[in-house]
Amino acid sequence: MIKRIKLRALTYLRNIYARIICPQVCFFCGEETGTGIPLCSKCLQKEITEPVLFRLKNPEKFCSSCGKILISEKEFCTDCRAKLREKENLRTEEREKSKKEDCAKPLLIQSDFLKKVYTIYPYKGRGGELLRLWKNQNMRGFAEIYASAIASFIEGMPELQNVPMVPVPPRPKKIKSKGWDQIEDLSLYLEQIYNLPILRCLKRMDGASQKSLSKEKRASNLKGKIFLKRQKSFSKSEDLKTVLPEKLIILDDVMTTGATLNFCAAALKEGGCKEVIGLCLFFD
């Protein structure tokens, strides 16, 4: 309740500051916004609200696996088709190996941890420009409007309703240098304003920033660095498998290779979660 009041007060003060002291102009059209974010009502509708409605009304235009928009493909994008073929080849190799070694243990493939991913906005173009304003220019008011977008998206997706969301944990060095994390801001609004369940159960060790690495190095950079954290309510002897819900959503801002989502999903699966879905604002 106190956090909710603080968030509403912060929005009110941000808007007052924007109207009286430092008027904000729209990043795209130049009109005064009257709010604490650089988006006028028309551009907000076009860039934030309408893509959510389009995503909900046209699910067939997005990849059923990674959530990226399809160009000419059907059901799966080109990248996911290649991954599915690779996965099937690995399974075939494992079956042959099991026969030779008289062992029935299946090969655990990284992508098996994550059932599917939902995304809403393309990162390329205006989406990336807005995300950079939010993350790099410290315009934290964007968390409020993106939380509204996610809440609307979940409302239109029965598969995601009443499922706890697990925020992707930030690197400790990032919090130390920046002082805040956009995913935590987003989670606070979802939790306090829209009453959506948030489960902060993952922890991350320091490492290089993912955005500075090639696709090949992103997975190795995260190996062993994302894990379940033990909460105060857990006894030393208690198994984490008994407290995690069977179904969870991993919440992140951008999906590029899916490495971060997969390592988070792996940690949740190790804790006993049976089904993990990714939900990202942007696809790159």
Please place each PLM-identified region on the residue numbering.
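Glycine-rich phosphate/pyrophosphate-handling loop used in enzymes and phosphotransfer proteins
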Residues: 1-284
